[in-house]
Amino acid sequence: MNRFTRQAVLYLLILMIVVGIFQQLNQEPEAEEDLFYNEFLNKVEAGEVDRVDITERDIEGELTDGTSFVTRDPGDPELIETLKEYEVNIKDHEVPGPPWWASLFTYIIPFVLLIAIFFFFMQQSQGGGGRMMNFGKSKAKLHEGDQKSNVKFHDVAGADEEKEELVEVVNFLKEPQKFIDLGARIPKGVLLVGPPGTGKTLLGRAVAGEAGVPFFSISGSDFVEMFVGVGASRVRDLFENAKKNSPCIVFIDEIDAVGRQRGAGLGGGHDEREQTLNQLLVEMDGFDVNEGIIVMAATNRSDILDPALQRPGRFDRQITVNAPDLKGREEILKVHARDKPLEDNVDLKVVARRTPGFTGADLENLVNEAAIYAARRNKNRIGMKELEGAIDRVIAGTEKKSRVISEFEKKIVAYHEAGHAIVGYLLPHTDPVHKVSIIPRGAAGGFTLMLPEEDRQFMTKTELLERVSTLLGGRVAEELKLKEISTGAQNDLERATTIVRQMIMEYGMSENLGPITLGQKQGQVFLGRDIARDKDYSENIAYAIDKEIRNMVDSSYQEARETLEENIDKLEKIAQALMERETLVAKEIKMLMEGKDLPPIEESEDTETLDFLVDEQQDTKSESDNEQQSQENQADNNQNDSTTEFDDEQQTNDDNRPEDDEDNEEDKNKGNNDFNLKIDYNKEDKDNKDKDK
């Protein structure tokens, strides 16, 4: 029987005893004879009653034969007169109250119960399992022994360099002497920085699973709560516990909640978070050398962290965790798919090529959506068709096949998307067009998907201008074929203007203004984002900027117009094909652009897309066989592997796999690269126009 059970039984026994005493005290003494009131009156009239004793509620008395009796007093106003008439002795006296000790119990027992309950909760809070009164105690969880994390380094894919640095940190704690012998100082802190979903917290969990030392984990929001001074107290308690368990690792997730830059702002010059940060700074820089406590932290907003928190001596290392490349995405897909049954035709390398810019969280969600899709179709294995549907769902949302649109609106969307596709297909420096659809998905009325041939981090001026021309191709197509323009191009115009403005004001790509950056951003640290831009240029420069934006947009618009006018027949063919089939994949677009007719519609668009993926996989396998054949005939295997891999990538790109999400690519590459996937929104999509920023 544990301590809690013993205390509960003791308090229960005390309560039962007290209740029993009260019942005993309030129990009425039993009378020898209990009469009804009418019987009592009959005996009075018969002269059988000798005397009565009238109390507050009862009438007690004695009959002439010596028998005692009791009856209830109903409050009869004529009772006294009746008793006098029949010469019954009457004794009327004040009702005695309860004894003094009973009254004492009435006041003492509630007070005693309150004290007992108070001490009970105090005992529970001091036992470590609860935090009822320990507001200043740290909420960090200790992972060691059976409570150690099950995540290991082999469960983290696509972050080889990041894992190497963290393995070194773990080795510092496991074998510190070999580093100390060389005069090396154990790092005091490691800061994991990167976009959301790239695996920073997962890396922390992997360190907890691999480290042979205690591991404390806590969130940045767990420090500051309702009471003043709680945050600093919890920081002190956390590091006191860490020192008792040294060597150990302390992991603070989302440290920007407590480590935001200090200074006067919307929150005032000094607040609870600032006091907590000051205590954290003192604790991190107050260690003895080689004490064996390493602080790990993760954040996706390193730009708002206090500079004193990031300096060497506190966070000696900053590890940037970016979105994975092609190889990393394939490894991540393998990790998430290893416990899921896949069909034989599933090629994760094809899926990885279709998802540039996806983070680890995106890929995990993709595989999970594919599993849900397969279960919905009552399948026991996941195939390429399910993965294709999952990619479309993650990128563009759920198909709105039930949405009813008029033929005129359908024609507007068809010509609009055909304009995007043709301009993007014909201009030499754009990404290949992989899918065009006029089926509404999510908030989009139709979309054109363009997949880059390789992971990109930089864009040239020519590529940006052609990107703008592709965005404007939808509006130009509406104007050429329908002699009318619609609100469907609103998001295209906004994005095109944004690209041109960035080219002029941030990238220095204007011929007239030259290689300069205009308009410095203001950062409000207590808001955690940039809410204003300094106008550090004159009105003449502002006029020149507006004029340059107009000229570049007009030039791109004219380029798109000339491209479509020269291929007006192809615009008509693709638009009609979209009206008929609703979705065109890369192979079908290529056939139409080459003047060929499409085969009859025999299967649904999902099956056509799946067939395209299977053909691509077969092409990849065929090239892999050719690679093995060529390896047998050449002496230099390494050179042959490199050449075959290049050919494999080139063939896959020529096959033009289906789409990828430009919006995801923008988020994971650089904030301004809103260039890989074009999704055109209707007038309903104004609320989603900032998705690509």
From Swiss-Prot:
Cellular component aspect of the GO annotation: plasma membrane
Record's subcellular location: Cell membrane
Catalytic site: 417
Region described as Disordered: 618-693
Superkingdom of this protein's organism: Bacteria
Residues passing through the membrane, by range: 8-28, 101-121
Stretches of the chain found on the membrane's Cytoplasmic side: 1-7, 122-693
SMART domains: AAA
NCBIfam families assigned: FtsH_fam (TIGR01241)
Subunit structure of this chain's protein: Homohexamer.
Protein's name in the database: ATP-dependent zinc metalloprotease FtsH
Native source organism of the sequence: Natranaerobius thermophilus (strain ATCC BAA-1301 / DSM 18059 / JW/NM-WN-LF)
Lineage: Bacteria, Bacillati, Bacillota, Clostridia, Natranaerobiales
